[in-house]
Amino acid sequence: MKDKVDSSRARSDAEVITASRFFDGSVLRGPTAVRVHKGLVESIEDHRGLCEHYLLSPGFLDLQMNGFDAVSCAGSGAGITAAELAELDSMLLARGTTRWLATLVTDDLRRVVSRTDSVRAAASGAPGCLGVHLEGPFLGSKLGAHDRARVLPPDTAFAHSPPAGTLLVTTGAESTEAPAFIRELAGRGVVVSLGHTAPSREQWDQCVRAGASMVTHLFNAMSPVHHRDDSMALMALVDDRINFGLIADLVHVSADAVRLAFSAAPGRVCMVSDSVAWNDPGSQRRGIELRDGAPRLPDGTLAGSSTALSG
């Protein structure tokens, strides 16, 4: 393998990074040397000899990241501060995540909007943060760890003017208002993902035709794969119009479920961490603690993950 990006530009002062395994975004390769000059890749070539690193990969993009360790995307007060967002960005960068969406979960809608504004205001100090993913409060019947008392039906008035910086919205698909809500958001360039819901086939088709293009964390908080009944997981797997997130921490889904997703839908799987700030005051107030490999509510309900995309 010898992929020259531009061999004429190779310079003696370029940095050469060697790794025993190199993932180029599609294929996992063997020992590789990558030559970099001023942040630009000049060449990618097979390498013979000792390698400095075990694995080299492009930076990860995480579309669903609620926080990490003691830093929540919601912040510790009215919203996240610039210092908190910068700390979160630094922790993720150290773990290989170079781009990510700050994910805000179900809460009072005014508080969600305020927190979205806080992320946008603080983002200049966190270059990895691309914007916000609103995972709630417009969810369906499969709520998981979300606060049922704060869930709202899809609101077209909100969709007509979503908070600046909102790039992705998760919504339920069962409500009669869902297609109009989706159409309004999609028309404004917001990616709409179906999640925390158990739609019928008719509801699914209406929402996808309206502009929904993703599914949030496949297999989790949705109607499961079934050979006869309406199954959101199955519809997502077979519908080529849809990409989907997958929490491949082997707690949220099994290894066989991961294999099924990649086999059934090559090119449509988006790995997400769904990591949470399991050590922040908000999690502690809810009684969230690490048990059996993931953060959980006192009743055992999964409340996100404790891993970055690098594992």
Label for each model-derived stretch:
Residues V27-V36:
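A conserved glycine-rich beta-strand in the N-terminal activation segment of trypsin-fold
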Residues G59-L61, V132, S193, M271-V272:
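Residue-level marker for buried hydrophobic side chains located in beta-strands
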Residues N66-F68, A86-R115, P127-S141, A164-E174, ...:
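Divalent metal-dependent hydrolysis catalytic cores, especially in the metallo-beta-lactamase
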Residues R115-S118, V151-T156, H227-A233:
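Charged helix-capping and loop-helix junction motifs
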Residues A173-E184, R201-E202, V225-A233:
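Active-site-adjacent beta->alpha loops and helix N-cap segments on the catalytic face
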Residues Q203-G311:
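Active-site-adjacent C-terminal substructures of enzyme catalytic domains
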